[in-house]
Amino acid sequence: MGQYVLLNGIVLTARDKVHKYLFSKRPDAGAMPFSLEGGVIYHCGPIIRQSPEGARVIAAGPTTSARMQMYEPFIIEHYNVRGIMGKGGMSGAVANAMKESGCVYFHAIGGAGALLAQRIKKVSGVWLLEEFGPAEAMWAFEVEDFPAVVTIDSQGNSMHRQIEDLSRQRLEEILISG
């Protein structure tokens, strides 16, 4: 926990609508163009520019992960996901699912969507574009040296929870001594 990492390989975007779809429809691996098994899901609604040469990512900053946490334990366990990336952390229930499945949470840099887009070398494909539109579709990105920090480790330890606990403790100390 707290390790700075550079991700390389395929990252799949998924926001609210894709999470709800995966949870409610439960498509099997054969029904999806991408495999989630062993993969990384990025909570991101990218800005994509289409051209005759293909899709190019203009911005790809993280979105708040808490909105997806009601679906995430199921998705981690059912699809055997090994990494979730976003911003803001996730609940204790998600951290427990991560512990059970050997998954981690990567915190990406909020407010740096254009900078992060430079680490996306190729758009490999898209799923559910017609149904959900470009921001909510699932995109497959080939990333190179994509920066993030591990803030929930595969043992379920959460840096977010530790900071909350420490902040609460310090606030109590200030209020009592004040």
Identify the residue ranges that each predicted region occupies:
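Structured core elements
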Residues: 6, 41, 149-151
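Active-site/ligand-binding-proximal alpha/beta "capping" segment
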Residues: 72-73, 150-178
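Structural motif
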Residues: 3-4, 9-10
